[in-house]
């Protein structure tokens, strides 16, 4: 059987030129639930992770601790189907709107921001 080789997707030069990366070549990606508007998590992307995400609509990130790419949900089943990707006005932050399957956080919580509320909304009496 002949194996088909697939080419690694590359980031369009026009998009790459607009990105403002940190010293490690990374851009923060804020991830939002497309259905609820909840902010789910923040992860890091480089050009390869962004290109893979744009090509597949599967959220792909760069792990700073493991020094490798990871596709959200590949091992947990808690996948993110990417509905849209936006670049902020300064070009230094991405916004991914996703259809999230189960919890987005590695703890199993719906979002990575469920656990520690530092300042809650005021309740009028």
Curated annotation (Swiss-Prot):
A single MF term (Gene Ontology): phosphoribosyl-AMP cyclohydrolase activity
Catalytic activity: 1-(5-phospho-beta-D-ribosyl)-5'-AMP + H2O = 1-(5-phospho-beta-D-ribosyl)-5-[(5-phospho-beta-D-ribosylamino)methylideneamino]imidazole-4-carboxamide
GO terms classed as biological process: L-histidine biosynthetic process
Main localization category: cytoplasm
Cofactor notes: Binds 1 Mg(2+) ion per subunit.
Record's keyword annotation contains Glycosyltransferase: no
Superkingdom classification of source: Bacteria
Subcellular location: Cytoplasm
GO cellular component terms, semicolon-separated: cytoplasm
Cofactors required: Mg(2+); Zn(2+)
Enzyme class of the recorded protein, top EC level: hydrolase
Keywords: Amino-acid biosynthesis, Cytoplasm, Histidine biosynthesis, Hydrolase, Magnesium, Metal-binding, Zinc
Transmembrane segments: none
Residue numbers binding Mg(2+): 88, 90, 92
Record family assignment: Belongs to the PRA-CH family.
Physiological role: Catalyzes the hydrolysis of the adenine ring of phosphoribosyl-AMP.
PANTHER family to which the protein is assigned, alphabetical: HISTIDINE BIOSYNTHESIS BIFUNCTIONAL PROTEIN, PHOSPHORIBOSYL-AMP CYCLOHYDROLASE
Alphabetical list of HAMAP family matching this protein: HisI
Subunit structure: Homodimer.
Protein name (database record): Phosphoribosyl-AMP cyclohydrolase
Organism: Cutibacterium acnes (strain DSM 16379 / KPA171202) (Propionibacterium acnes)
